[in-house]
Regions:
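N-terminal signal-anchor transmembrane helix
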Residues: 38-58, 71-100, 107-120, 124
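Soluble catalytic domains of enzymes that build or remodel membrane lipids, polysaccharides, and related
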Residues: 89-217
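Short amphipathic alpha-helical surface micro-motifs
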Residues: 62-68, 81, 169-171, 186-189
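Charge-rich, low-complexity amphipathic helices
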Residues: 33, 40-41, 76, 137, ...
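Non-catalytic terminal accessory segments
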Residues: 1-75
Length: 217
Protein backbone atom coordinates (compact mmCIF):
# COMPACT_ATOMS: atom_id res chain seq x y z
CA UNK A 1 0.00 0.00 0.00
CA UNK A 2 2.84 2.36 0.84
CA UNK A 3 4.50 1.75 -2.52
CA UNK A 4 1.24 2.22 -4.43
CA UNK A 5 0.58 5.53 -2.73
CA UNK A 6 4.21 6.57 -3.21
CA UNK A 7 3.88 6.34 -7.00
CA UNK A 8 0.50 8.08 -6.96
CA UNK A 9 1.92 10.78 -4.70
CA UNK A 10 4.75 11.48 -7.14
CA UNK A 11 2.27 11.96 -9.99
CA UNK A 12 0.02 14.21 -7.93
CA UNK A 13 3.04 16.15 -6.73
CA UNK A 14 4.14 16.83 -10.32
CA UNK A 15 0.64 17.97 -11.29
CA UNK A 16 0.41 20.31 -8.30
CA UNK A 17 3.87 21.68 -9.02
CA UNK A 18 2.87 22.33 -12.64
CA UNK A 19 -0.17 24.33 -11.56
CA UNK A 20 1.87 26.25 -8.99
CA UNK A 21 4.40 27.02 -11.71
CA UNK A 22 1.64 28.33 -13.97
CA UNK A 23 0.44 30.63 -11.21
CA UNK A 24 3.97 31.96 -10.71
CA UNK A 25 4.41 32.54 -14.43
CA UNK A 26 1.01 34.20 -14.81
CA UNK A 27 1.78 36.63 -12.01
CA UNK A 28 5.24 37.41 -13.38
CA UNK A 29 3.91 37.83 -16.93
CA UNK A 30 1.22 40.21 -15.67
CA UNK A 31 3.78 42.27 -13.76
CA UNK A 32 6.05 42.43 -16.81
CA UNK A 33 3.16 43.57 -19.00
CA UNK A 34 2.12 46.26 -16.51
CA UNK A 35 5.72 47.47 -16.25
CA UNK A 36 6.01 47.59 -20.07
CA UNK A 37 2.79 49.60 -20.44
CA UNK A 38 3.84 52.05 -17.73
CA UNK A 39 7.31 52.41 -19.25
CA UNK A 40 5.97 53.03 -22.76
CA UNK A 41 3.44 55.56 -21.50
CA UNK A 42 5.86 57.53 -19.32
CA UNK A 43 8.90 57.41 -21.60
CA UNK A 44 7.17 57.70 -24.95
CA UNK A 45 9.26 54.86 -26.36
CA UNK A 46 8.46 51.25 -26.99
CA UNK A 47 10.28 48.42 -25.27
CA UNK A 48 12.87 46.60 -27.40
CA UNK A 49 11.11 43.44 -28.62
CA UNK A 50 14.27 41.32 -28.53
CA UNK A 51 14.90 42.40 -24.96
CA UNK A 52 11.28 41.69 -24.06
CA UNK A 53 11.57 38.14 -25.44
CA UNK A 54 14.76 37.67 -23.46
CA UNK A 55 13.08 38.82 -20.25
CA UNK A 56 10.13 36.52 -20.89
CA UNK A 57 12.57 33.63 -21.09
CA UNK A 58 14.46 34.69 -17.99
CA UNK A 59 11.35 34.87 -15.78
CA UNK A 60 10.98 31.11 -16.14
CA UNK A 61 14.19 30.56 -14.16
CA UNK A 62 13.10 31.88 -10.72
CA UNK A 63 9.59 30.48 -11.15
CA UNK A 64 10.81 26.97 -11.97
CA UNK A 65 13.51 27.16 -9.31
CA UNK A 66 11.08 28.22 -6.58
CA UNK A 67 8.60 25.50 -7.54
CA UNK A 68 11.21 22.74 -7.61
CA UNK A 69 12.75 23.96 -4.36
CA UNK A 70 9.45 23.96 -2.48
CA UNK A 71 8.04 20.81 -4.02
CA UNK A 72 11.08 18.56 -4.08
CA UNK A 73 13.87 19.83 -1.84
CA UNK A 74 11.99 21.21 1.17
CA UNK A 75 9.65 18.22 1.43
CA UNK A 76 12.69 15.94 1.73
CA UNK A 77 15.02 18.21 3.66
CA UNK A 78 14.26 16.87 7.14
CA UNK A 79 16.22 18.52 9.93
CA UNK A 80 16.80 16.88 13.30
CA UNK A 81 17.67 19.34 16.06
CA UNK A 82 19.00 18.16 19.42
CA UNK A 83 18.77 20.47 22.41
CA UNK A 84 20.28 19.87 25.86
CA UNK A 85 18.27 21.34 28.75
CA UNK A 86 19.75 22.06 32.17
CA UNK A 87 17.85 19.88 34.64
CA UNK A 88 20.18 20.29 37.61
CA UNK A 89 17.24 21.40 39.77
CA UNK A 90 15.32 18.28 38.79
CA UNK A 91 17.68 15.30 39.17
CA UNK A 92 15.04 12.80 38.04
CA UNK A 93 14.99 14.41 34.61
CA UNK A 94 18.71 13.96 34.02
CA UNK A 95 19.16 11.70 31.01
CA UNK A 96 15.49 11.87 29.99
CA UNK A 97 15.20 12.11 26.20
CA UNK A 98 12.04 13.57 24.68
CA UNK A 99 11.50 13.52 20.92
CA UNK A 100 9.23 16.19 19.46
CA UNK A 101 7.57 15.90 16.05
CA UNK A 102 5.28 18.50 14.50
CA UNK A 103 3.79 19.85 11.25
CA UNK A 104 4.59 16.92 8.99
CA UNK A 105 1.44 17.60 6.91
CA UNK A 106 1.06 14.17 5.38
CA UNK A 107 -0.29 14.40 1.85
CA UNK A 108 0.83 15.03 -1.70
CA UNK A 109 4.19 16.51 -0.68
CA UNK A 110 4.94 14.20 2.23
CA UNK A 111 4.21 10.50 1.88
CA UNK A 112 3.61 7.74 4.41
CA UNK A 113 6.95 6.28 3.37
CA UNK A 114 8.70 9.48 4.44
CA UNK A 115 6.67 9.43 7.66
CA UNK A 116 7.88 5.89 8.33
CA UNK A 117 11.48 6.91 7.64
CA UNK A 118 11.25 9.83 10.08
CA UNK A 119 9.80 7.65 12.82
CA UNK A 120 12.46 5.03 12.18
CA UNK A 121 15.19 7.67 12.46
CA UNK A 122 13.69 9.00 15.70
CA UNK A 123 13.41 5.49 17.15
CA UNK A 124 17.09 4.85 16.42
CA UNK A 125 17.97 7.85 18.59
CA UNK A 126 16.35 5.95 21.50
CA UNK A 127 14.27 8.71 23.14
CA UNK A 128 12.18 7.87 26.21
CA UNK A 129 9.03 9.38 24.77
CA UNK A 130 7.62 10.96 21.63
CA UNK A 131 5.39 14.03 21.73
CA UNK A 132 3.55 15.12 18.58
CA UNK A 133 2.02 18.58 18.48
CA UNK A 134 -0.43 18.45 15.62
CA UNK A 135 -0.69 19.05 11.89
CA UNK A 136 0.42 15.51 11.12
CA UNK A 137 -2.67 13.86 9.65
CA UNK A 138 -3.40 16.17 6.72
CA UNK A 139 -4.77 13.80 4.08
CA UNK A 140 -7.98 11.81 4.39
CA UNK A 141 -6.65 9.20 1.97
CA UNK A 142 -3.64 8.17 4.04
CA UNK A 143 -4.47 9.23 7.61
CA UNK A 144 -5.55 5.72 8.63
CA UNK A 145 -2.40 4.16 7.19
CA UNK A 146 -0.24 6.78 8.93
CA UNK A 147 -1.94 6.11 12.27
CA UNK A 148 -1.19 2.39 11.90
CA UNK A 149 2.45 3.16 11.17
CA UNK A 150 2.72 5.50 14.16
CA UNK A 151 1.07 2.96 16.45
CA UNK A 152 3.54 0.29 15.31
CA UNK A 153 6.37 2.46 16.66
CA UNK A 154 4.91 2.96 20.15
CA UNK A 155 6.92 0.06 21.69
CA UNK A 156 10.12 1.98 20.89
CA UNK A 157 9.21 4.77 23.33
CA UNK A 158 9.15 3.46 26.94
CA UNK A 159 7.31 6.49 28.35
CA UNK A 160 4.78 6.50 25.51
CA UNK A 161 3.67 8.46 22.45
CA UNK A 162 1.54 11.55 23.06
CA UNK A 163 -0.45 13.62 20.61
CA UNK A 164 -2.40 16.88 20.63
CA UNK A 165 -4.51 18.39 17.85
CA UNK A 166 -3.47 20.95 15.28
CA UNK A 167 -5.79 22.96 13.04
CA UNK A 168 -5.28 20.60 10.10
CA UNK A 169 -6.61 17.64 12.07
CA UNK A 170 -9.78 19.67 12.61
CA UNK A 171 -9.92 20.49 8.90
CA UNK A 172 -9.51 16.86 7.83
CA UNK A 173 -12.16 15.45 10.17
CA UNK A 174 -11.48 15.37 13.87
CA UNK A 175 -14.15 12.79 14.75
CA UNK A 176 -12.76 10.10 12.48
CA UNK A 177 -9.23 10.73 13.74
CA UNK A 178 -10.42 10.58 17.36
CA UNK A 179 -12.04 7.21 16.73
CA UNK A 180 -9.01 5.83 14.89
CA UNK A 181 -6.52 7.01 17.52
CA UNK A 182 -8.67 5.67 20.37
CA UNK A 183 -7.97 2.15 19.07
CA UNK A 184 -4.19 2.61 19.36
CA UNK A 185 -1.56 3.00 22.07
CA UNK A 186 -1.14 6.67 21.14
CA UNK A 187 -2.32 8.90 24.00
CA UNK A 188 -4.27 11.96 22.84
CA UNK A 189 -4.12 14.89 25.27
CA UNK A 190 -7.04 17.19 24.52
CA UNK A 191 -6.77 19.97 27.11
CA UNK A 192 -5.53 17.30 29.47
CA UNK A 193 -2.39 16.51 31.42
CA UNK A 194 -0.71 13.28 32.41
CA UNK A 195 1.90 12.56 35.06
CA UNK A 196 5.07 11.21 33.51
CA UNK A 197 7.28 11.08 36.62
CA UNK A 198 6.15 10.99 40.26
CA UNK A 199 7.90 12.23 43.40
CA UNK A 200 8.46 15.53 45.17
CA UNK A 201 8.98 17.23 41.81
CA UNK A 202 6.71 15.36 39.39
CA UNK A 203 6.76 15.86 35.64
CA UNK A 204 3.44 16.52 33.92
CA UNK A 205 2.81 16.64 30.20
CA UNK A 206 0.02 18.95 29.03
CA UNK A 207 -1.70 18.76 25.66
CA UNK A 208 -3.77 21.74 24.47
CA UNK A 209 -6.29 21.75 21.61
CA UNK A 210 -5.87 24.17 18.72
CA UNK A 211 -7.40 27.35 20.18
CA UNK A 212 -8.87 28.86 16.99
CA UNK A 213 -10.97 25.75 16.39
CA UNK A 214 -12.74 26.33 19.71
CA UNK A 215 -13.65 29.95 19.18
CA UNK A 216 -10.69 31.13 21.25
CA UNK A 217 -11.88 29.24 24.33
Amino acid sequence: KILDFEYASILIKLVVMWYVLQVFLSIIALLVKIFRLIYEKTSGTKVDESRRRFLHGVVWVPAISATLYGGLYESRNIEFVEQDIDCSAFPKLNGLKIAHLTDVHLGNFFSVRQFYEILNEIAHKAPDMLVITGDIFDSGKINDEAIKILNAFTPYFPFGVYFCWGNHEHIRGIKHLQEALSKTNIKVLNNQSIKILSGDKPLYLLGVDYVDERGGQ
